[in-house]
Each structure stands twice: as structure tokens, then as C-alpha cells.
Curated annotation (Swiss-Prot):
Pfam families: MutS_I (PF01624), MutS_II (PF05188), MutS_III (PF05192), MutS_IV (PF05190), MutS_V (PF00488). One of its GO terms (biological process) is mismatch repair. One of its GO terms (molecular function) is ATP binding. The keyword Glycosyltransferase does not apply. Belongs to the DNA mismatch repair MutS family. This protein is involved in the repair of mismatches in DNA. It is possible that it carries out the mismatch recognition step. This protein has a weak ATPase activity. Keywords: ATP-binding, DNA damage, DNA repair, DNA-binding, Nucleotide-binding. InterPro entries: DNA_mismatch_repair_MutS, DNA_mismatch_repair_MutS-lik_N, DNA_mismatch_repair_MutS/MSH, DNA_mismatch_repair_MutS_C, DNA_mismatch_repair_MutS_clamp, DNA_mismatch_repair_MutS_core, DNA_mismatch_repair_MutS_N, DNA_mismatch_repair_MutS_sf. It comes from Latilactobacillus sakei subsp. sakei (strain 23K). The gene is mutS. This is DNA mismatch repair protein MutS. ATP binds at G609, P610, N611, M612, S613, G614, K615, S616. It comes from the Bacteria.
């Protein structure tokens, strides 16, 4: 019977470390591999597709294990972290050759979803935010940082909804909380698939003091400390690149909740989840990674301050007016690497020689950028921007003098320091060079002396330098000339006392040279680290210029205009407006522009028309135009006069919230309620067919009540599309409501959508025409025509006037809709046809997707064709 394995010192050491990191995969360094054991090994082997083996396979309790080569470990770590796991990296802290007893090992870094430093391919323009939350009553302290750039923001928030909206907007993958945060709040984070990590209060550090020096609110101070302590605990190194925290209020920016950002497809397509087809995709003509990240931040947080908006507009206008200078700027920007993340790597201690060369190359472009701005600064639009463009010449000169332009990736293998930078290093290199010349001379000398022309001198790490002679030439070798060292299949290797003596000198010079190079490199790195703040300020300045030139490029390409924004007026006058993304996809020649005009007397447009005619596009067009305008960009229109909006609310589309278990209708009502309760007269509301997620009568009653409430109480500018045509009668009683519709005509039996917004309500829905195009049986269509004629002959009941008092019923429109389904005198048909006709009458064609409509038509055809 197999015996149980006695725990070895190594496994005891492993378990001791693992106990400190129970929620992480432990990558335990053994020689050239990172090994995983026990449950970690079983799970990792599945996630990483590794071969699962075992230590002591024949024992009663074999230990599951798997491993990865140390040089390939980063890829495996990335896979685990991308899936929401943590990885603790445990390194050997001493050379196994010189260690006495067990090799000392300790965790040097805990990699988590929120602390990833290495940018992945294609992710250069994305931030990776780690967030932190503390709670006190109904108040929350909230902070976030991107460890790769050092950016730090903090706020005090009084609503869980606002807190969640901030976290979802940041696309955070990890939040740090303490044990005082209520369980229902933690559960809300988990429900959004955010990893929750715990960090209770730790000691004040220099980093905590530096980061929080401009902050005074108690909750803000507490959450900064919690976040910085967590970073120090997980990263186990100096965090000198963390920037001073900037306090902000969500109310400082145009409020866009997560639902609005999704519905408007600002940064992610509803269909694919990718950037393509979004407003970010359209606007992104940035040349730098940091510019791309800043563009996304501006898009997520449009401005409210009119002066800031105008300042951006003025800079965009200057770039538009100076094409050649803008081209020169773009050329310089293409040679600027990611200054923010380079500075982060310098401070983090992970920078290498190539990174420093990229930093030098970037700094070389700054004088060129300054020259461009100085040349187009007639209106002083770039005065502030110029103050941020410090070329940091001392750092550039240091790198130019010290670092080899062709540096290797490794910082410990030599070849990183320039010749002439350090006298001692040059001496070592000369010794190495002379030694190698001596080896070449020895090889030539021995070939001539022995007559063996393929004799060669080689080197490996086991035997050092050797003389190699092929087996075929061994007979030509003078007896006793060399000392045999190694026998190979086809050759013999030899040494001589003279060769070993020279080897010692060469290797000693190489070893000392490599060690000195690393020491010199760290000195350079530390000198650069002292200028981190200057580099970060420069990076922000360059990023902002990159975004503004991107606005200019897009505005020129698509013939955008500078909008006029006002805070003393609520009027909207958008002439020949276009949906920017649809226009890019279709091409300007094919896109049909539409005006949006809402003067002092109009707060609400009630939009009617068939599905797929362009109602949703029209609504999104206005919202995207507002967002672009308040970002400081020009807008797609012939002219644009807009108010500065404080919030945009949308309910467009109907996707079930499967994660939280809420139905389409529940989500619809919650979003509508959020808009109604939070909107002000300075807000913009877009409601697309509210009420379609429930029974017809309930839906229309709710739609009418919502329209009346917004009209009477909220007074926000509102675009409300509906398939309840009866609601158009509300324009007779609601003074600030105006009807518009999407035009459609029949030409040669074909239904043609004009995609043009026209005044007044739609006069028909074209439902039977669509059914005909879908191939419905002729007898069924004739029956539908009969029913439609009878319904159209029925007198219309007027919509009851809306009142402010909520207890007053507003039933007329609902009664009218109910009357559509009262029994009619029908032409004689068989029961089967009558059943299908009844189903058609009750089918909500206007809210069905094309696929749903086709599937239903197919079912009806099957029923009618049965014999």
C-alpha cells in the first residue's frame, strides 16, 4: 500500500506563502519554471490548457502540479487576470548555487485585474482603472486610478446609482472596499461582474501624503488612503508616479448614465461590443496612445462650462484654418510614444533601454510641436497649451549620452550603455575586445600549426572556451598539444592552460562590465525618475493637442460646423443635421439631413412613422450632436444653435437585463422613472416607443401619462417616438408639444421611406402594405383591407385634455385604442381564416423586429395553407 508523502521543506515553504494569498494563483519559481500545486494546478491546467502532472505520483497522496517557463509566464498571467483572477508571483530571492539550505523565496507582486501594468496589443488607447469605495451612512468616498499612468481622481458621492454609473463608465474590473461597506453595496458590484478586493486601513506612507495633499473631505481622504495602501500591498515597490489626486464632482459634466452611453453607442457597438461603428470610432483620428485615451475620457464626460467649451472650439478652429501647420503637428505626433506609460514604467522600475530611447525620441518632437503652435497662435488660443510643453531637455540629453540606441530588451545582459559614457566600463569593454582579438589570432595560429583548416575556438556556459577538432582530423593533431575536455559524436573539444587563463580574464571583464552597466542604467533611471511630474504634465499637454487636432481632421473631412452654445436660452435650431456615424457609413451623398427646431414654445416633439423609417436615427442624431458640441468639437449640420444641456436621458431599444433578472418592461420603466425624477428644464430626454413592452392598453396609458408629466412638470426638451398614433391628438391640448413624422410614399406599389422629418402626425402606418411585400395570402390581405376600412370609418374620440392633477384619468386615447378591437360585422370567412385575421389584428407590427414579423408571417401562412 502506497505511503503518504512526508511534507518536504520546499512544499512547507510553498504552503506558507500560499496561505498568505488564498484568493490568488501562486506562481512559485523553481529554476527556470513557475510551478503551481494542488488546487491551483488543477484549475490553472484547465484555464491555461496545461498538462496536469503530479509530484510523488506513486504516493498515496500525489500532489497535483503544472508549470510554465519563466520567459513565457507573462502570457499565462495575462490570460488568468483577463478572466478576473489574481496571480501572486513568488520569486527566488537568492542564487540557488550559493544559498545555504532552502532558497529564500517571497512574493514580489500580486497582479490583479485592476493593477495590470503591461499594455496588451491593441489596448494602447484604453485605460485600466482600479477603483476604491468607502461608505459612511448614505455617503460614499470614491477614487480611481490607472496604475500604468498614475492618474488619480476622487469624489464624494451620495447615491449608489451615481456610484455604479461612475464605475460602469470607467469599465472598472476591480474595486477595493473595506469591511464597513454594506453587503448590499458589495453585492451590487458583484452583480456587475466587478472583482471585489478587501483592504482595511493601513499605515500612512509618503505616497499617501503626496497623493492626498490637495484633498480635504474626510471620505475622500479615507478612500485615497485605502486605494494607495492596496497598491503598495500588491505591488511591493515605490509608487512615485502616482499623481496628486484631483477632486471632481459627476455634476461638473454633462450627465450620461450607463444606459444612455450604451444606447447612443458612444464607445461600444450594441451589436458587436467593439469600437467600430461608434462615435469614438468616428472621432478618433488621434496619433498617440495617450491622445486616444483622453478622447474617450472627453467623450464620456462632455463639458458644462461654456468658457471651457469655447476654448476647445477656438483651438479646433485654429487647426482647421492652418492645414499645413496641422500636418506638421500630426507628423510630429506620430513620433511621440506613450509618454504617460513610459513615465509610469520609469517610476515603477520596469523601464528598459528601449523604453528610454522611445522617451528620448518623443522629447525630440516637443520643440517642433511648440513651433507649430507658436505660428498659429494669433488669437492666443494656445497660450495655456504652450505652458505645458516643457521639452525636458535635461532628460533627453542624459538619455542621448548614456543609452545605446540599439539597446536590448533585457537590462541585465549588457549592451545598454553607450561607449564613452563611463571610463571604467570602456576599460572592461576594451579588455573584452582585446581578449576576443587574441582568441581570433589563436584560432588562426593553431590552424596554421596543425594544418587543420576547420579547427575553431568556441564557447559555452558549461565548459567556457575550447578548441574544437572534427573526428576526421584528429589524426592530424600533434600528440599532447591539447588537453581533452569533451567528446562529441563528430568532434573532440580541447583546452590549453593559456586558453583557460585568457578565458578567466575575458569572463571576468564581461561579468564586471555587465554588472557595471546595470548599475549605470539604474543611475540613469533614477535621474529620469526625478522628473516624473514634468513628464506627466507634458504628456497631458500633448494628449490634449492630439484630441483637438483629431476634432479638426474629422470636422474638415465631413464638413462640420462650429455650433453656437448658450446658457441663457433653451432653443434648439439644428439646420440640416446628420447622424455622424450613419453619415460616415453611408457617405454624405446618400445621407438625408434633417432639421431639429424647438423654440421657446416647444419642449416636446412627438414622432410617428413606421418602424425602420428613421425615427431612432433622428433622435440619436440630436443627442450625438449635443455631446460633440459640449466636447468642444464641431458638429454635423449646416448650422447649429444649441443650449448647454446638463443631462441626457435615453430609452432607445429593448434589451432584457438578464444579469439582474429584470424584464424589458421593468428596465424600460426604471429608465423612464430615472429620467422623469432626475431631469431638469435644461435636460434632454429621448424616449423611443415607451410602453411597447406591456399590453397595448397599459402601454398607451403609460405613454400618455409620461408625456403629460414631462410636459407639465419637467419641461425638459424631449423627443418622444410612438407607434400609438392616437397620442398625436395630445398636440391639441399640450401647448409645448408638436407633432412630426417620418415621410413615406407609395410609388408603383412599392413603399418608399423618405427619411425626412415632416411637420404633423403620420397619416397611416402602412402595415398591410408591408404584409403584402412579405407575401401574405391575397384572401387574408383582402380581409385585412375590409377590417381597416371599417375601423377607419369609425368616429374618432378626442383625447381627453391633460391635467396637472395626477388623480384625473386621461382615458380617451386608451378608450379609442380599445375600440379598435370591438366586434365588427365581418364578411363571411371560414373559422381558420378568421382565427388568423384575429391574430393579425392583435399583432403589434410596429414594435416587432423584422425577423419576428417574418417568423410570425410564416406561421400564419402555414395555418392558412393547411387542408
Amino acid at each position: 500500500m502506497p505511503q503518504k508523502t512526508k511534507e518536504t521543506p520546499m512544499m512547507a515553504q510553498y504552503q506558507k506563502v500560499k496561505d498568505q494569498y488564498p484568493d490568488a494563483f501562486l506562481f512559485y519559481r523553481l529554476g527556470d519554471f513557475y510551478e503551481l500545486f494542488n488546487d491551483d494546478a488543477v484549475k490553472a491546467s484547465q484555464l491555461l490548457e496545461l498538462t496536469l502532472t503530479a509530484r510523488n505520483k506513486n504516493a498515496a497522496d500525489p500532489i497535483p502540479m503544472c508549470g510554465v517557463p519563466h520567459h513565457a509566464a507573462q502570457n499565462y498571467i495575462d490570460i488568468l487576470v483577463d478572466q478576473g483572477y489574481k496571480v501572486a508571483i513568488c520569486e527566488q530571492m537568492e542564487d540557488p548555487k550559493t544559498a545555504k539550505g532552502m532558497v529564500k523565496r517571497e512574493v514580489v507582486q500580486l497582479v490583479t485585474p485592476g493593477t495590470v501594468m503591461d499594455e496588451k496589443a491593441g489596448h494602447a488607447k484604453q485605460n485600466n482603472y482600479l477603483t476604491a469605495v468607502v461608505a459612511q451612512g448614505d455617503q460614499f468616498g470614491f477614487a480611481y486610478t490607472d496604475l500604468s499612468t498614475g492618474e488619480m481622481k476622487v469624489s464624494q458621492i451620495s447615491s449608489l446609482d451615481v456610484l455604479l454609473n461612475e464605475m460602469l463608465s470607467l469599465q472598472t474590473k476591480e474595486v477595493v472596499v473595506n469591511h464597513d461597506v454594506p453587503s448590499e453595496v458589495v453585492q451590487a458590484f458583484v452583480q456587475q461582474q466587478i472583482l471585489v478586493s478587501y483592504q482595511d486601513e493601513g499605515a500612512d506612507t509618503a505616497e499617501v501624503s503626496f497623493v492626498s495633499q490637495n484633498i480635504s473631505q474626510p471620505l475622500a481622504l479615507a478612500v485615497i488612503k485605502q486605494l494607495v495602501v492596496y497598491l503598495a500591498t500588491t505591488q511591493k515597490r515605490h509608487l512615485g508616479h502616482l499623481q496628486r489626486a484631483q477632486a471632481y464632482e459627476p455634476s461638473q459634466y454633462l450627465k450620461l448614465d450607463h444606459s444612455a452611453k450604451m444606447n447612443l453607442e458612444l464607445t461600444a457597438s450594441l451589436r458587436t461590443g467593439h469600437k467600430s461603428g461608434t462615435l469614438l470610432w468616428l472621432l478618433d483620428e488621434t496619433k498617440t496612445a495617450m491622445g486616444g485615451r483622453l478622447l474617450k475620457q472627453w467623450l464620456e464626460r462632455p463639458l458644462l462650462d461654456l468658457n471651457q467649451i469655447k476654448n476647445r472650439q477656438n483651438q479646433v478652429a485654429s487647426f482647421l484654418q492652418h492645414y499645413f501647420e496641422r500636418t506638421n503637428l500630426q507628423e510630429a505626433l506620430t513620433k511621440v510614444y506613450d509618454l504617460e506609460r513610459l513615465a509610469g514604467r520609469v517610476a515603477f522600475g520596469s523601464v528598459n533601454g528601449r523604453d528610454l530611447i522611445q522617451l528620448k525620441t518623443s522629447l525630440e518632437q516637443i520643440p517642433k510641436i511648440k513651433d507649430v503652435l507658436t505660428g498659429i497662435n494669433e488669437t492666443q488660443a494656445f497660450d495655456q497649451a504652450l505652458t505645458r510643453l516643457d521639452p525636458v531637455d535635461d532628460v533627453r540629453t542624459l538619455i542621448e549620452t548614456a543609452i545605446n540606441p540599439d539597446s536590448p530588451i533585457s537590462v541585465t545582459d549588457g549592451g545598454i550603455i553607450q561607449d564613452g559614457y563611463d571610463e571604467q566600463l570602456d576599460q572592461y569593454r576594451n579588455a573584452m575586445s582585446n581578449g576576443k582579438q587574441w582568441l581570433a589570432q589563436l584560432e588562426a595560429q593553431e590552424r596554421e600549426a596543425t594544418g587543420i583548416h576547420n579547427l575553431k575556438i568556441g564557447f559555452n556556459r558549461v565548459f567556457g572556451y575550447y578548441i574544437e577538432v572534427t573526428r576526421a582530423n584528429l589524426s592530424s593533431l600533434p600528440e599532447g598539444r591539447y588537453e581533452r575536455k569533451q567528446t562529441l559524436t563528430n568532434a573532440e573539444r580541447f583546452i590549453t592552460p593559456e586558453l583557460k587563463e585568457k578565458e578567466q580574464l575575458i569572463l571576468e571583464a564581461e561579468e564586471r562590465s555587465t554588472a557595471l552597466e546595470y548599475e549605470l542604467f539604474t543611475q540613469v533611471r533614477e535621474q529620469v525618475k526625478l522628473q516624473i511630474e514634468r513628464l506627466q504634465t507634458l504628456a497631458k499637454g500633448v494628449a490634449a493637442l492630439d484630441v483637438l487636432q483629431s476634432f479638426a481632421v474629422v470636422s474638415e473631412s465631413y464638413h462640420y460646423v462650429q455650433p453656437t452654445l448658450r446658457t441663457d436660452s433653451r432653443e434648439i435650431d439644428l439646420v440640416d443635421g446628420r447622424h455622424p456615424v450613419v453619415e460616415k457609413v453611408l457617405g454624405r451623398q446618400k445621407y438625408i439631413p434633417n432639421a431639429v427646431q424647438m423654440g421657446k414654445e416647444t419642449d416636446m416633439l412627438l414622432i410617428t412613422g413606421p418602424n425602420m423609417s428613421g425615427k431612432s436615427t433622428y433622435m440619436r442624431q440630436l443627442a450625438l450632436t449635443v455631446i460633440m458640441a459640449q466636447m468642444g468639437c464641431f458638429v454635423p449640420a449646416k448650422s447649429a444653435n444649441l443650449p448647454v444641456f446638463d443631462q441626457i436621458f435615453t430609452r432607445i431599444g429593448a434589451a432584457d437585463d438578464l444579469i439582474s433578472g429584470q424584464s424589458t418592461f421593468m428596465v424600460e420603466m426604471m429608465e423612464a422613472n430615472r429620467a422623469i425624477m432626475s431631469a431638469t428644464a435644461n435636460s434632454l430626454i429621448l424616449f423611443d416607443e415607451i410602453g411597447r413592452g406591456t399590453a397595448t392598453y397599459d402601454g398607451m396609458a403609460l405613454a400618455q401619462a409620461i408625456i403629460e408629466y414631462i410636459h407639465d412638470h419637467v419641461h425638459a426638451k424631449t423627443l418622444f417616438s410612438t407607434h400609438y398614433h392616437e397620442l398625436t391628438a395630445l398636440a391639441d391640448t399640450l401647448t409645448a408639444l408638436r407633432n412630426v413624422h417620418v415621410g413615406a410614399v407609395e410609388e408603383n406599389g412599392e413603399l418608399v421611406f423618405l427619411h425626412k422629418m415632416l411637420a404633423g402626425p403620420a397619416d397611416k402606418s402602412y402595415g398591410i402594405h408591408v404584409a403584402k411585400l412579405a407575401g401574405m395570402p391575397e384572401t387574408l390581405l383582402q380581409r385585412a383591407d375590409v377590417i381597416l376600412g371599417q375601423l377607419e370609418d369609425k368616429p374618432k374620440a378626442p383625447v381627453q385634455p391633460a391635467t396637472v392633477a395626477p388623480a384625473q384619468p386621461a382615458a380617451a386615447a386608451v378608450e379609442e385604442q380599445m375600440a379598435l378591437f370591438e366586434p365588427e360585422v365581418a364578411a363571411p370567412v371560414d373559422k381558420k381564416t378568421d382565427k388568423v385575421v384575429a391574430a393579425i389584428k392583435n399583432f403589434d407590427l410596429m414594435s416587432a423586429t423584422p425577423l419576428e414579423a417574418l417568423n410570425q408571417l410564416y406561421e400564419w401562412q402555414k395555418q392558412l395553407n393547411k387542408h
